[in-house]
Design a protein with these regions (language model features):
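Conserved SAM-binding loop
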Residues: 5, 40, 72
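Conserved catalytic/acceptor-binding region of the Class I
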Residues: 55-123
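Conserved Class I S-adenosyl-L-methionine
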Residues: 104-185
Length: 185
């Protein structure tokens, strides 16, 4: 299969440019400049929160071929598990997408259908501390806020949960895969 990907960041396009089978386009979800009815599937992976849902849905409907499918994917820590929920609260990681709240794109799509997949990512406490530094709340925070979050994470992982440095921790994740067909397609 071939992939056409739309990315507004020149740096991100450059970083991903070596991925085989992908043609990168400068643009945004609301105005892709891609041709009408040219794609069987349009997917937003970890990006739906960045777009205007109405306009991005209308644009997806425009570029989808008849019978085309819109997909919206979220990978997130499984916050239904209490210790994971607390971990995400400390990291302020935004793992808040719920199965009972389907996305609402514009563009005349049939109701969203959900497939949910559980999986685990094995990480050490040190890798979780690094993961915390990738969250937008950390990046936007003051130095004092960053230090506080890292200190809270160290306390939670090492003292409260009792993990040792370098020890493997199986982090439960859930992937929410929403899909909808164009109405009347």
């Amino acid at each position: 299969f071939l992939v056409d990907a739309v990315e507004p960041s020149e740096a991100m396009r450059a970083q991903a440019s070596s991925i085989p089978g992908v043609t990168w386009h400068a643009g945004v979800a609301e105005e892709t400049t891609l041709p009408d009815a040219a794609f069987d599937i349009v997917v937003f992976a970890q990006s739906w929160h960045w777009v205007d849902h109405e306009r991005a849905g209308v644009e997806a409907a425009r570029i989808l071929a008849p019978g085309g499918v819109l997909g919206i994917v979220w990978n997130q820590m499984d916050v239904s598990i209490p210790w994971v929920h607390r971990l995400t609260r400390i990291m302020r990681s935004g793992d808040v997408h719920r199965p009972d709240r389907p996305p609402t794109p514009g563009g005349g799509f049939a109701p969203m259908r959900l497939t949910q997949v559980a999986w685990q990512d094995v990480m050490t406490p040190e890798q979780i501390l690094t993961l915390g530094t990738t969250r937008s709340s950390y990046i936007r925070s003051s130095e004092a806020g960053r230090e506080r979050m890292q200190a809270n994470l160290r306390w939670y992982l090492y003292e409260h949960l009792g993990y040792a440095p370098g020890q493997d921790i199986a982090i439960p994740y859930t992937t929410l895969v929403w899909r909808a067909e164009r109405e009347g397609a």
